[in-house]
Curated annotation (Swiss-Prot):
UniProt-recorded name of the protein: Pentatricopeptide repeat-containing protein At2g17670
PPR repeats mapped onto the chain: 121-157, 158-192, 193-223, 229-263, 264-298, 299-333, 334-368, 369-403, 404-438
Key words of the record: Repeat
Any one Pfam family match given in the protein's UniProt record, by short name: PPR_2
Listed InterPro entries: Pentatricopeptide_rpt, PROP1-like_PPR_dom, TPR-like_helical_dom_sf
Family indicated by similarity: Belongs to the PPR family. P subfamily.
């Protein structure tokens, strides 16, 4: 033997090392007494990733502990090079990827006993900790067991330890255990950094009621002086906006000043998007005006969101006014801007106006996409402008533009109702050949429409 297996030699020694981050400033007011009207996300900076299984072939053929000890003893006895920390970490990670937590810990203890020169490092215990948190057979007692081993070997759990444990538990759906462990580690050892705190907060928002999230925020602040930052507030506001609880969102915004923070453009855009989704154009405009009053400069996303919301609410003239404001502010309208406006115009029956907007869009060098064409196709067919609709369809077909379900269904129904069944079959063929829709979906729409036509003829509703 004599050679260390390549899969052991390939594992990096500093797999889990990362820089710590200072805690956030400024406390918010008490959340505890707030109750949510709705039920239960802001992007977070990427943080430490817990260790993954080795990419090369695992030298351990079986999870059997005796076999693992024998393999390790054989390598240790015949190796011509010193076995360093990297090697021992690789052994534990490779074996841990196929074994239960209890056996992995026992192999670690065997290595300690049989190798007097082995001094486990922090990365060693983080490998064991990650395995204890991720293993499907593991309980929280195994996590505590690894943490106790760490302390007994002279290494206090730090922010990296908390980060690895919390992320690993959350990624396996054990959010309650992650929450309890964070509080325990904060009390006994070290508070989490902002990234870990916000990571857990985001997961709590995804799977817990809002009052549970507020209780966690209050406990961490009151008991451990760990306070939410602007990212934390953005996570909370994004969560309540997604649950359509916009009153709570505005409440949280009103408390940002008390917490020493100033809302940024991203946060205002999040709230505006919530109002626009509910077709509350006036409230969306109110958010825009508040931004301006607070000295927060709107960006392209702000204008696109506002134009989308106003168009959806049928307030097309206002949407066009903000299109001009957007250009005056130095932002070039993009495909999303024009498509939103076209959709609003088609909803109001202004399909020809939407079609002229397509020409304006292309004249400005902005390329329409599949959604743009399908929006116009749907609008023209709904307005019974079949000549224009077929002209647009032929242009789409020659350019290889795919049909979307709404545009396809409206076109097929309009053709059948106009007595142009052969043309409807041709549209069906294109939808299938271009893989715009599945065969079943495309045929279902055509079949339903033809059944309607047959019934209408029987009742004398159509010639």
């Amino acid at each position: 033997m004599g050679k260390v297996p390549s899969s052991f030699r390939s594992m990096p020694a500093n797999l889990l090392v990362r820089k710590t981050t200072p805690s956030p400033p400024a406390p918010p007011r008490d959340f505890r007494n707030r109750t949510a009207v709705g039920g239960d996300s802001a992007k977070l900076p990427q943080n430490t990733q817990a260790p993954r299984e080795p990419s090369l072939r695992n030298p351990f053929k079986s999870p059997n502990l005796s076999d693992a000890k024998s393999l390790f003893n054989s390598i240790a006895a015949t190796s011509r090079i010193p076995l360093d920390l990297k090697f021992h970490n690789s052994v534990l990670q490779s074996y841990g990827s196929i074994a239960v937590v209890n056996d992995t810990v026992k192999l670690f203890q065997h290595i300690l006993k049989s190798q007097p020169n082995f001094r486990p490092g922090r990365s060693t215990f983080l490998i064991l900790l990650s395995h204890a948190c991720r293993a499907p057979d593991s309980s929280i007692s195994n996590v505590h067991r690894v943490l106790n081993l760490m302390v007994n070997n002279g290494l206090e759990p730090d922010q990296v330890t908390t980060d690895i444990a919390v992320r690993s538990l959350c990624e396996t759906g054990r959010v309650d255990e992650a929450k309890d462990l964070m509080k325990e580690l904060t009390e006994k050892h070290s508070p989490p950094d902002t990234y870990t705190y916000n990571f857990l907060l985001k997961h709590l928002c995804k799977c817990k009621d809002l009052h549970v999230v507020y209780e966690f925020v209050d406990e961490m602040r009151d008991d451990f002086d760990v306070k939410p930052d602007l990212v934390s507030f953005t996570i909370l506001i994004d969560n309540v906006c997604n649950s359509k609880n916009l009153r709570e969102a505005m409440y949280l915004v009103s408390k940002l000043g008390n917490a020493g923070f100033k809302p940024d453009c991203f946060l205002y855009n999040t709230i505006m998007k919530g109002f626009c989704t509910l077709s509350k154009g006036s409230e969306a405009v109110g958010v825009y005006k508040k931004m301006k009053e607070e000295g927060v400069e709107p960006d392209q996303i702000t204008y696109n969101t506002l134009i989308f919301g106003l168009s959806k609410a049928g307030r097309v003239e206002e949407a066009r006014m903000y299109l001009k404001t957007m250009v005056d502010a130095g932002y070039e309208p993009d495909t999303a801007t024009y498509t939103s406006l076209m959709n609003g115009m088609c909803r109001k029956g202004e399909s020809l106006g939407a079609l002229s907007l397509l020409e304006e869009m292309e004249a400005r060098g902005c390329a329409p996409n599949d959604c743009t064409y399908n929006t116009l196709l749907h609008g023209l067919c709904k307005a019974r402008l079949m000549d224009k609709g077929m002209e647009l369809y032929e242009m789409m077909k020659s350019s290889g533009v795919k049909l979307e379900s709404n545009g396809y269904a409206t076109l097929v129904r309009s053709l059948v109702k106009s007595g142009k069944v052969a043309e409807a079959y041709e549209v069906f063929d294109y939808a299938v050949d271009s893989k715009s829709l599945s065969d079943a979906s495309a045929y279902s729409t055509l079949e339903t429409t033809l059944k309607w036509l047959k019934k209408a003829k029987e009742q004398g509703l159509v010639p």
